[in-house]
């Protein structure tokens, strides 16, 4: 998996903590397209350091990205799904 971009999109404070919405763009060899997904990092404190966010995504959320890529592979394979430029 090649993660192309990790960008903090939004931070919202709730009664339980801080919701960090992160846009992650990635490619994998089995997919025809690159995809951007929105991931949720739920933390006790507000995190704005880009390196920390990149670390959390690449460690905590890596499995979610792999699952998404497998789902997209199935869609591309079964439905001949492609993104038009």
Enumerate the predicted regions with their spans.
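Amphipathic, interaction-prone secondary-structure segments
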Residues: 2-35
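Acidic, low-complexity intrinsically disordered segments
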Residues: 5, 34-85
């Amino acid at each position: 998996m090649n993660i192309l971009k990790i960008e903090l999109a939004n931070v919202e404070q709730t009664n339980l903590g801080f919701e960090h919405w992160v846009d992650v763009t990635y490619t994998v060899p089995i997919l025809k397209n690159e995809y951007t997904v929105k991931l949720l990092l739920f933390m006790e404190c507000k995190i704005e350091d880009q390196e920390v966010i990149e670390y959390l995504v690449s460690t905590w959320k890596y499995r979610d990205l792999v699952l998404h890529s497998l789902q997209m592979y199935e869609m591309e394979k079964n439905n001949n799904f492609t993104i038009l430029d």
